[in-house]
Amino acid sequence: MPFAVRIGLNSGEVVVGRIGDDLHMEFTAQGHVVGLAQRMEAVAESGHICLSEHTARLVEGYFQLQDLGRITVKGVSEPVWHFDLEAVGSFRTRFDRSRARGLSAFVGRDREMAALDAALERARGGSGQVVGVVGEAGTGKSRLCAEFVERCRAREIPVLEGRGVAHGRAIPMLPMLEMWRAFYEIGDDDGPETTRAKIADRLLLMGESYREVLPFIFDLFGVPDPANPSPAIDPEQRQKRIHGVLKQVLHDPAYDGRHVILLEDLHWFDGASDTYLETTVESVPDTRNLLIVTFRPEYHAPWMERPYYQPLPLQPLDPEAIYGLLRDQLGPDPVSYTHLTLPTTPYV
């Protein structure tokens, strides 16, 4: 029997606890926030998700929303806005949202930027490099890398990017597929046929030897070719075959191996991505690629012992840099912030 679900979402503080008697006890949440969520569910159409204004503000940019106007809600003096969730948006992280709203001044990272520039020059000279930007949350890992890759693009150096996300640990190869989608120039709206065509065009341009492995790459991207399915082989052998192909691409003379590859937030990588990351790291030394990875201090991996790996720890911003941020945000009057006690790891 076909059925559809409707969902209502609201955000805010609630009271939680056990409610009932000795015969029946439930753990539940109560309060106005819960009531408004129930109201959103009641007005949602079948198969739709309806959001309150508060929730809509929290997910702005992460999802595409349709403004449905105001409705009258029992217990609320004024009509409330409600929204329909239509599709996934372009934002994936807080940094994406900050960039869309306008970033603060980039200060206090001259030493780190110089280290990345030096690693890039070594890589372009034929000694591939791996640089690990490590720091606690909020120290500016993403901002440093964003500034660096923009400089690279200004010099017409190709950049491939992939990023781990907290909710993506259960999705195999999510950050790696993001990186390779950029390599094959696959868009979000490309269907299976277009995706297969772009992969085949790029690989066969490099050589006919890739034709026999196309079915495996199609499978990796979730677009198997019904007319030419991949052979049934052991999963471990299949993984080795795919890793071998991707490693071969990085070493292929037909591949213009002078990319900057940026993989962010390794601490949120799934197991399959971690395994492939090790393959990528091992592929770097004999290329002209610069691989930059970012992670928090608790992340560790065996490949960090490689001689071509360079850690780049981010130290807290010094007071002069902090005051530079304040001047950018608050203006030049030092009296307005002279007596502030400042943390040195602002989210920028």
Give the positions of each predicted feature:
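Key residue(s) within conserved catalytic/signature motifs
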Residues: 1-17, 27, 31-340
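Single conserved hydrophobic/aromatic residue that forms the stacking wall/gate
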Residues: 339-348
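Short conserved micro-motifs at the rims of enzyme active sites and ligand-binding pockets
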Residues: 20
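Short, surface-exposed beta-strand-loop junctions and turns on beta-sheet-rich folds
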Residues: 23-24
